[in-house]
Amino acid sequence: MPGRWSAETRLALVRRARRMNRALAQAFPHVYCELDFTTPLELAVATILSAQSTDKRVNLTTPALFARYRTARDYAQADRTELESLIRPTGFYRNKAASLIGLGQALVERFGGEVPATMDKLVTLPGVGRKTANVILGNAFGIPGITVDTHFGRLVRRWRWTTAEDPVKVEQAVGELIERKEWTLLSHRVIFHGRRVCHARRPACGVCVLAKDCPSFGLGPTEPLLAAPLVQGPETDHLLALAGL
């Protein structure tokens, strides 16, 4: 019903967005960063490696990397060839190696070897933009942040929370709809939903907890039995149970 959404007021949009966030919280009660890490430095490194790669691929790569490079100084003094060899499976390994060495050097020279906990300082580091900074702030320091990755941007546009393509504008628009304390969890929920249910080409509309509030309902199969096989991930049984299957 295109008319229903085109006539939506600002207040109605805020209410719908927050209702959808609550539904996502029910669908994904245990969300988390899917990159493996134990320290802010490890998360910064893993997030840099995740560009144009998958979390699964990064998580297969980082155990050996983290065992070899434990501190910012280790990265600052890394042998480039050795570092490139370790991170090669994540793709674009030459650029990423340069970013990691630069990251280590910047942390040693300007921050005493420690990852800073503010946006303005994080974005001055090599390889760290707002997306990476928000991942670090939200998951290593508990500071709310909205992570606009490919899934997040695709879904919030699909939901008509915003029409913006620029990640910074998406972050700002969503931040005005959802309470700040929810930002990090919202980011995880949306990304989980994009990976498991709301796929780019064939979303599982028929089993989606957001169906009644989604302007794009019908892009994928709306019949539950046809949509069910499209659901992916360890939460599949829970998601199908919510759909009555």
Swiss-Prot record:
Transmembrane region(s): none
Superkingdom of origin: Bacteria
EC number assigned by the record: 4.2.99.18
Cofactor(s) required for function per UniProt: [4Fe-4S] cluster
Catalytic activity: 2'-deoxyribonucleotide-(2'-deoxyribose 5'-phosphate)-2'-deoxyribonucleotide-DNA = a 3'-end 2'-deoxyribonucleotide-(2,3-dehydro-2,3-deoxyribose 5'-phosphate)-DNA + a 5'-end 5'-phospho-2'-deoxyribonucleoside-DNA + H(+)
Record's cofactor remark: Binds 1 [4Fe-4S] cluster.
CDD domains membership: ENDO3c
GO biological processes: base-excision repair, AP site formation; DNA repair
UniProt keyword annotation of DNA-binding present: yes
Binding locations of [4Fe-4S] cluster: 198, 205, 208, 214
Domain (HhH) ranges: 119-138
Record GO cellular component, one term: plasma membrane
One term of GO molecular function: metal ion binding
Record function comment: DNA repair enzyme that has both DNA N-glycosylase activity and AP-lyase activity. The DNA N-glycosylase activity releases various damaged pyrimidines from DNA by cleaving the N-glycosidic bond, leaving an AP (apurinic/apyrimidinic) site. The AP-lyase activity cleaves the phosphodiester bond 3' to the AP site by a beta-elimination, leaving a 3'-terminal unsaturated sugar and a product with a terminal 5'-phosphate. Has a preference for oxidized pyrimidines, such as thymine glycol (prefers 5S isomers) 5,6-dihydrouracil:G, 5-hydroxyuracil:G, 5-hydroxycytosine:G and urea:A.
Protein family per UniProt: Belongs to the Nth/MutY family.
Protein name per Swiss-Prot or TrEMBL: Endonuclease III
Protein's gene: nth
